[in-house]
Amino acid sequence: LKQLEGAYSLICMTAEGLIGCRDPLGVRPLVIGRLNEAIIFASETVALDVVGAEFIRSVDPGEMVIVRDGEMTSIRPFAEQNPRPCIFEYVYFSRPDSIVEGTSVYSVRKAIGAELAAENPVQADIVIPVPDS
């Protein structure tokens, strides 16, 4: 992993189990869920909702989570760094009903819109959204 550079969240399946890991800066999200007896990984919480899984937690920046026989082990192979999550997770990549870093994507988008309206008010009759873009 120390040879990898850039933003990533990885999920690997081996003969022994699953491995989920996130880049040391936490640019890309990765979450852990439980579906019946299985531990699952996803890039956003809404994927857990779609399959009926229960959200357990987010994988921390630089953390590697190993799942064997239904048990999770956490390894932190990197020195702790100041996280730098990508703002595009909130404004573009994630679905509005997802939770990223403990915050509702919808609420972040709404707050950004309110800030934009306060900074640059315009005379308008209607706002046209671009759903799920």
Where in the sequence are the language-model features?
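N-terminal segments that mediate ammonia production and transfer
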Residues: 1-133
